[in-house]
Structure formats: structure tokens, C-alpha cells
Amino acid sequence: MAHSHSHTSSHLPEDNNARRLLYAFGVTAGFMLVEVVGGFLSGSLALLADAGHMLTDTAALLFALLAVQFSRRPPTIRHTFGWLRLTTLAAFVNAIALVVITILIVWEAIERFRTPRPVEGGMMMAIAVAGLLANILSFWLLHHGSEEKNLNVRAAALHVLGDLLGSVGAIIAALIIIWTGWTPADPILSILVSLLVLRSAWRLLKDSVNELLEGAPVSLDIAELKRRMCREIPEVRNVHHVHVWMVGEKPVMTLHVQVIPPHDHDALLDQIQHYLMDHYQIEHATIQMEYQPCHGPDCHLNEGVSGHSHHHH
């Protein structure tokens, strides 16, 4: 029986993530003040809805930026994985905030149907167009580039996407009000935009809760991983007791591997580690190698897939 673990890390994507968040925070915070004032002056709920999203965005971007900074702290004896999970927690809080603000906007829109208020279409249009441009800039800052975005940047981008949709909705409502004078267009567009944002927020909430509950990554099929290891690594007879979870954006795995006693134990261990890295991007794996079938009380976890279909070469 043998244990091994491998671990590598890189901070370059985190640096890029932090830079994205900082620039988007500057753009969003600056324009939020303009939109809040404009929303009150014009009397437009669609603008106030967009301003509400921008207010949430500003806090969300700041929180996400702080989380990325904290996540860079090195591991300690007490926090052995460092602070990587803090970014997931920030994404969870961001998703909750987005759900709450969306519900409040829908509630206010319903109130507007009961007691309509005058809306100044011209001012509403000017501010909505400016808001759209600011949101496009923020969204581009968060999304451009090919490197991996972490869950916080995804969360922040969803907030900004909500704002972008809000600005489009405000422009459509402003056009209707300018052309026809029909003010119910304002709360109607607010509700439609809010429902679109709510759908995205729900997806983000599910992803962050899955990570906080240490669920396996949705993209990883554990049964297939076990089958492939038994089929593609000749010495592997059985893979069991597999645990996979996420720490920040990094997948972490522990597993038991029953093997034919190898001529070179360390070479086989190294082969398994490289296999997990190359095929599943798992940089941190703790592997327990066994020469006999495992008889521990919890060794048959995930044993639904037979590990005996393997090839000898």
C-alpha cells in the first residue's frame, strides 16, 4: 500500500482575474452614481432597476476582488488549502444578492401597475444609452481574453450582463414612452429583464452551492474516469473510494487504486498522476495504491462500476 500526492499551482490567471474585476469595478461604480440620479429625476423604474443592479454590481465586484486577493494567501497549518474557497463563498453571496434585488424590482414593477407614475422619456433614453455603453465596456473587460475565468469573474460578468439587459430594456421602454406616451411599458420591461437575470442567477447559485457542499464538478463523470483508468493503464485492476471536489477553481481528488504489483512502484504512481492531470486537469491528487482487494468499511464507495475490464499488454 502506498500514498502519494501531487500539487502544482499558478497565480497568473488569478492576476488576470483581479485586473478584470478592478477595471470593471471602476467603470461600474462611476456610472452607477449617474444612473441613480437619472433614475430619480426621470421617474423611470426601468432606469432605477438598472441602477439597482449596478449598485449590487459595485458591491459584488468589490467583494469578488477582495475574495481573489484573500485567496492568494498561502496555506497555513489551520487552513491547509489556503483561502481558495473564499472565492466560491463570494460567488454564492453575489448570486443571493442578485436574486433578492431582482425580486424587489419585480415587486416595485407590480406596484407601478397599480399606481402609474409619469416618466420623462427623453432623459430616460439618454441615460439608458449611456448605461448600455458602460455595461458593454464592463462586460468586455470581464470576458475578453482566452484564459480561464474563475467563478467570481463569472458571477461578476452575470451581474454586468443583467445590467446590460436592463439598459436594453430601458431603451425599449423609453422609445415606447417617447412615441406613444404609454408608461406601463416601463414596469413591463423591468419585469422581463428581471426574469432573464433571475434565470442566470439561479444557475450561478447552483454552481456555487455545489462547490460549497463539496460536490464533484458537474463536468467530471466519475464512473467513466474509473472505466478509462482500468482500460488505459495496464497495471490498474480496480479504482474505488473516489472523492473529487473543488477548492476555488482547482479540482482535488483522493482515490484507491488496486494494481498488479509493478516493477517500478514510483513510475506507476507518476503515470497515474500524469494521467489524471492530462485527461482531467486534476493537479492535486492523493493516490492510495493497493495490491490486494480493499476490505475496509468504506472501500466500496462508488463501486457501482466494475473495475475489472482492463487490458494487459
Curated annotation (Swiss-Prot):
Its main location: membrane. The keyword Oxidoreductase does not apply. It is a multi-pass membrane protein. GO terms for biological process: zinc ion transmembrane transport; zinc ion transport. One of its GO terms (molecular function) is zinc ion transmembrane transporter activity. The chain crosses the membrane at residues 21-41, 48-68, 90-110, 122-142, 160-180, 182-202. It comes from the Bacteria. Disulfide bonds: none annotated. Residues 1-20, 69-89, 143-159, 203-313 are cytoplasmic. It is found in: Cell inner membrane. Residues 42-47, 111-121, 181 are periplasmic. The keyword 4Fe-4S does not apply. Induction: By zinc. Belongs to the cation diffusion facilitator (CDF) transporter (TC 2.A.4) family. SLC30A subfamily. Appears to be selective for zinc, not conferring resistance to cobalt nor cadmium. Involved in zinc efflux across the cytoplasmic membrane, thus reducing zinc accumulation in the cytoplasm and rendering bacteria more resistant to zinc. It may contribute to zinc homeostasis at low concentrations of zinc, whereas ZntA is required for growth at more toxic concentrations. This is Zinc transporter ZitB. It comes from Escherichia coli (strain K12). The lineage of its organism: Bacteria, Pseudomonadati, Pseudomonadota, Gammaproteobacteria, Enterobacterales. The gene is zitB.
